[in-house]
A protein has these predicted regions:
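Conserved G1/Walker A P-loop phosphate-binding module
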Residues: 1-102, 215-216
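Canonical P-loop GTPase G-domain recognition
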Residues: 20-32, 165-216
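Switch II of P-loop NTPase G domains
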Residues: 33-40, 75-81, 96-126, 134-148
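Hydrophobic packing within well-folded, soluble alpha/beta domains
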Residues: 56, 128-129, 206
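Hydrophobic aliphatic residues
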Residues: 60-64, 119, 210
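Conserved nucleotide-binding/hydrolysis micro-motifs of P-loop NTPases
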Residues: 75, 90, 97-99, 135-138, ...
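Residue-level signal for inorganic ion chemistry
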Residues: 82, 161, 206
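Conserved C-terminal guanine-recognition region of P-loop GTPase G domains, centered on the G4
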Residues: 113-190
Length: 216
């Protein structure tokens, strides 16, 4: 085992232990004034409605219902905070889904304002994970979200969800296209991760990435 491989293995094991420990819902914030104190690093999760964000959060934390999927896409317009570790070492932030066709214009405007202000003003936000459905690839609304992240100067990783739903050769093509798209954005991390909440593909790697991005 090389030195780099040993470091990756150690980080992966540290992340496994951390996520096997205390993980608790802290609060929901419908506006910035309700945000928790900025005292620990935060990693945010963003993605289109029905991208599988709740399922991925549940798989990441090893819990069945730490994050509940909304019945109506676009219904949840709050930032949901989860504490990880005892004492708390980092927070996961479940951001409201975007691209919801059924949502009223006012709801969409409120979403943009809440998310934009959070991204621009949250000093402890270390990374945003942008979730993309592997079956569909990047959509125009995803590109809009990436531009918002670029403008806010928030570093982000692209994470493919539901990778088990397509064939291996299709996944390789989607990964290549997505990485090419990510390279066009100044704030995007060059590595794109492929995951599956069902088969747990990429979950250990995602935990390690979260730990590394949090800088703890």
């Amino acid at each position: 085992m090389t030195e780099d491989e040993a470091a990756v293995a150690a980080l992966t094991e540290e992340a496994r232990i951390l996520f096997a420990g205390r993980i608790e819902f802290l609060k929901s914030a419908p506006a910035l004034k309700f945000l928790p104190d900025p005292d620990v690093p935060e990693i945010a999760f963003a993605g289109r409605s029905n991208v599988g964000k709740s399922s991925l959060l549940n798989a990441l934390t090893g819990r069945k219902s730490i994050a509940r999927a909304s019945v109506t896409p676009g219904r949840t317009q709050e930032l949901n905070f989860f504490e990880v570790g005892e004492p708390t070492r980092l927070r996961l932030v479940d951001m409201p889904g975007y691209g919801f066709a059924k949502a009223p214009i006012k709801v969409a405007e409120n979403w943009r304002r809440l998310v934009r202000d959070f991204l621009r003003g949250r000093v402890v936000l270390k990374r945003t994970l942008l979730l993309i459905d592997a079956r569909h690839g990047m959509k125009p609304v995803d590109d809009e979200m990436m531009k918002m992240l670029d403008e806010a100067a928030v570093g982000y990783r692209v994470v493919l969800t539901k990778a088990d739903k397509i064939k291996a050769e299709e996944l390789a093509e989607v990964l290549a296209r997505t990485q090419a798209d990510a390279r066009k954005h100044i704030a995007a991390h060059p590595q794109v991760l492929a995951t599956s909440a069902e088969t747990k593909l990429g979950i250990a790697e995602l935990r390690a990435a979260v730990l590394a991005d949090a800088g703890i």
